[in-house]
């Protein structure tokens, strides 16, 4: 049996800077050799008396249904409400743009890119503009960014509701989009940063499932007002007013949430971060073996950089500084584009037009079908959020996008068949494939769309990665929504065929480049991205075990050195006291 005490004591004598991040893990050529070398020295090490091989095992932490996490879930639920804003807007505009009262009120043409298309796409312009202010959440914190964003959406919703002209409506929608982007960037970042590694898939994944809740409320409120106030401005004005409901709730209850522990460490408030972890991760246990380890990992990840430093906060060059940074940025860009350009935006915003193209022309029926579509996607996304930590991110993406391509193939065939024959069976088949597409796509992409970009980013670049994410997704949505009315009118079902081939392209890219993040701490992922091939490293279990052992050893050294410093302080004071007594006696 190894002599644990001798191993620990030998490490305690080493200064903390003997294990350097770059020297140990930064050289691609010697990457695995360095990890193997570090791993050889980890035998017998403990953290607070717990062997390192057990330090990250979930046996030390309860499951997601444990009562100790209820407080954490309460915090996250408040931020989840931010996800409803884009879902509400998508279903709202997708429901009201076919209403005659709405089209006449604002003098719009349903197939006009400069009319209906512009009203839709201005939201994406506002999103792109708002994205450039996302890094400000590094300045004052995630919580203020969430609150300011939601307050801005409330004001924008009031403007949109009171307007009587198309220009004012467009302005109000830009205002909503601008501030919704700030809140929608800060909220998933907050969820990813406050969640323990073994729960992050569920905690952060559930965030975007409330996109469908906003969509459901918008669709059915529009359906209700359309039934009760036909041919009246109330049919679309009331849903426009209701757009402020969810962000208003965040403004009221958002003051109750504490700040993200990772942001607190990034601005030097380490004790507050430690208290957060003790309270929300470890059920108040100040002696838990993972406390010092988690804190040490977070502290090291910032490399002494002040997160709120204006020069650092606005410097987007950090997204592309190193090879691993560029790989991360590539994944953020791909995820942002794929999340909006897989055919899902067409279904979200233009479902009524899709239904009209297969013979379903009743406005109230189309609005109702829009609501049912939202329910289908919501249920599927919740299932995905709970399974994503079991099947993994890569398998989830690959399964969803391949299923989506098959569903769009079926939709293309049924739509083409209906155009030729006008048969009811073809129309019903198209409806089935629309819902199949929504359910399959939402299973993986909805819970992971906002989560994945935060997972693959570092603590230092997460806000800037969100900037990149929202700019790219905004451009993708703008292209989609501005071009879709014309495309659906002119090329009809061939528009769906285009997305079939694009989804196949996505499958290939995801298979060869996307990194698996399941179960890794955000700090462990930093090591994965430094590997010569991050995608291969992320699924190499032997490599990941070495990474974990290396990080645990590093943390053990830090803890030991910190304890030594604390022990030396009283000894020093005692020595001074004895020296003073000796001087007094000699006098």
Swiss-Prot record:
Answer whether the UniProt record assigns the keyword Membrane to this protein: yes
Report membrane topology. Answer: Multi-pass membrane protein
InterPro entries (alphabetical) = MFS_dom, MFS_sugar_transport-like, MFS_Sugar_Transporters, MFS_trans_sf, Sugar/inositol_transpt, Sugar_transporter_CS
Comp. bias (Low complexity): 1-10
What keywords would UniProt list here? Glycoprotein, Membrane, Sugar transport, Symport, Transmembrane, Transmembrane helix, Transport
One Gene Ontology molecular-function label: carbohydrate:proton symporter activity
Transmembrane domains' residue ranges: 73-93, 117-137, 144-164, 168-188, 203-223, 238-258, 331-351, 371-391, 395-415, 425-445, 471-491, 494-514
- Specify the glycosylation sites in chain numbering: 111, 231
Provide a GO CC annotation, any one. Answer: membrane
Extracellular topological domain residue ranges: 94-116, 165-167, 224-237, 352-370, 416-424, 492-493
User: Which intervals of the chain are annotated as region Disordered?
Assistant: 1-42, 568-587
Give compartment(s): Membrane
Q: Where is the composition biased (Basic and acidic residues)?
A: 19-35
Tell me which parts of the chain lie in the Cytoplasmic compartment: 1-72, 138-143, 189-202, 259-330, 392-394, 446-470, 515-587
Q: Name one Pfam family in it.
A: Sugar_tr
The role this protein plays is: LAC12 mediates the transport of lactose and it would appear that the permease works in part by a proton symport mechanism.
Concerning its family, UniProt says: Belongs to the major facilitator superfamily. Sugar transporter (TC 2.A.1.1) family.
Please report the name of this protein according to its UniProt entry: Lactose permease
Q: What is the organism of origin for this protein?
A: Kluyveromyces lactis (strain ATCC 8585 / CBS 2359 / DSM 70799 / NBRC 1267 / NRRL Y-1140 / WM37)
């Amino acid at each position: 049996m190894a002599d644990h005490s001798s191993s620990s004591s030998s490490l305690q004598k080493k200064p903390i800077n003997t294990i350097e991040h770059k020297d140990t893990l930064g050289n691609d050529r010697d990457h695995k050799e360095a990890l193997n070398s570090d791993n050889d020295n980890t035998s017998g090490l403990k953290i607070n008396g717990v062997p390192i091989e057990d330090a990250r095992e979930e046996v030390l932490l309860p499951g997601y249904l444990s009562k100790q996490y209820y407080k954490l879930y309460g915090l996250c639920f408040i931020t989840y409400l931010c996800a409803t804003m884009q879902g509400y807007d998508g279903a709202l505009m997708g429901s009201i743009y076919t209403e005659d009262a709405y089209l006449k009120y604002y003098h719009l043409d349903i197939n006009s890119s400069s009319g209906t298309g512009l009203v839709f796409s201005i939201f994406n312009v506002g999103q792109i503009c708002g994205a450039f202010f996302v890094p400000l959440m590094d300045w004052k914190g995630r919580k203020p960014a969430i609150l300011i964003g939601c307050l801005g959406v409330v004001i924008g919703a009031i403007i949109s509701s009171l307007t009587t002209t198309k220009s004012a409506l467009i302005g109000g929608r830009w205002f909503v989009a601008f501030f919704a982007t700030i809140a929608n960037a800060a909220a998933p970042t907050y969820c990813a940063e406050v969640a323990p590694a073994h729960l992050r898939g569920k905690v952060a994944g559930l965030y975007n499932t409330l996109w469908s809740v906003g969509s459901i409320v918008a669709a059915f409120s529009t359906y209700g007002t359309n039934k009760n106030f036909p041919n009246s401005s109330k049919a679309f004005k009331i849903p426009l007013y209701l757009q402020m409901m969810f962000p208003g709730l965040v403004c009221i209850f958002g003051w109750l949430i504490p700040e993200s522990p990772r942001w607190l460490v990034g601005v030097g408030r380490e004790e507050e971060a430690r208290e957060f972890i003790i309270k929300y991760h470890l059920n108040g246990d100040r002696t838990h073996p993972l406390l010092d380890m988690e804190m040490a990992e977070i502290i090291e990840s910032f490399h002494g950089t002040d997160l709120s430093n204006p020069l650092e906060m606005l410097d987007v060059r950090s997204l592309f500084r190193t090879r691993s940074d560029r790989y991360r940025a590539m994944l953020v860009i791909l995820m942002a584009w794929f999340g909006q350009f897989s055919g899902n935006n067409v279904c979200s915003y233009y479902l009524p037009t899709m239904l009209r193209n297969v013979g379903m022309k009743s406005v109230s029926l189309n609005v109702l079908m829009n609501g049912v579509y939202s329910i289908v996607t919501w249920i599927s996304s919740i299932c995905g959020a709970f399974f994503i930590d079991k099947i993994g991110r890569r398998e989830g993406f690959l399964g969803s996008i391949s299923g989506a391509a098959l569903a769009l193939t079926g939709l293309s065939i049924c739509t083409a068949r209906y155009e030729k024959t006008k048969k009811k069976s073809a129309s019903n088949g198209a409806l089935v494939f629309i819902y199949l597409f929504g359910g399959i796509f939402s299973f993986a992409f909805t819970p992971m769309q906002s989560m994945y970009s935060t997972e693959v980013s570092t603590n230092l670049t997460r806000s800037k990665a969100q900037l990149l994410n929202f700019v790219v997704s905004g451009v993708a949505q703008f292209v989609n929504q501005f071009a879709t009315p014309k495309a659906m009118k002119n090329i009809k079902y061939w528009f769906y065929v285009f997305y079939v081939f694009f989804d196949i392209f996505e499958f290939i890219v995801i298979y060869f480049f996307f990194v698996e993040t399941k179960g890794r701490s955000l700090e462990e992922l930093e090591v994965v991205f430094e590997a010569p091939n991050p995608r291969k490293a992320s699924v190499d279990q032997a490599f990941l075990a070495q990474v974990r052992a290396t990080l645990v050893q590093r943390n053990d050294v830090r803890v030991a050195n910190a304890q030594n410093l604390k022990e030396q302080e009283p000894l020093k004071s005692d020595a001074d006291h004895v020296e003073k007594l000796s001087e007094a006696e000699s006098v």
